[in-house]
Amino acid sequence: MTPTISPAVETKNVLDHLEPKEVLGLFEVLANIPRGSGNESKAADWVVAYATELGLEAKKDALSCVLVKKPGQGGLENAAPLILHGHLDMVCEKAEGVDFDFINDPIKLRSEEHTSELQSH
């Protein structure tokens, strides 16, 4: 489920032929949000909006750290909580002579049929 949030994130559907489609679709949305270290606020906003669309409790703090809560289900409603941790920022580095603005430009994904790797260019 790709969220319909504002501001909308434009994707080129580069990964549509790969599986799992839903996960890679979300990855493509996130790749289109510039998020170098110290510039992850828009990515954090997107995660909060997506979680909220899914009916989850979500909030972002002043440092763009995001907390999403999902209640237990299937008989585990009273189980101890589970915490998963990750990060939204990227370590931004480019080859000499490459013109790319990590503050404003989305990552351009490409998929090559002869490899299972995802590459950016």
Where do the protein language model's features map onto the residues?
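Flexible, glycine/proline-enriched loop segments at strand-loop-helix junctions
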Residues: 33, 37, 116
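Short "domain-exit" segments at the C-terminal end of structured domains
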Residues: 117-121
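Intrinsically disordered, low-complexity segments enriched in polar/charged residues with Gly/Pro
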Residues: 17, 43-45, 54-56, 94-98, ...
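A short linear-motif detector with a strong N-terminal bias
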Residues: 8-10, 16-17, 45-49, 60-64, ...
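A non-catalytic alpha/beta surface segment that caps or lines the substrate-entry region
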Residues: 36-83
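N-terminal hydrophobic or amphipathic helices/low-complexity stretches enriched
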Residues: 1-33
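Active-site metal-coordination/substrate-binding segment of hydrolases
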Residues: 77-116
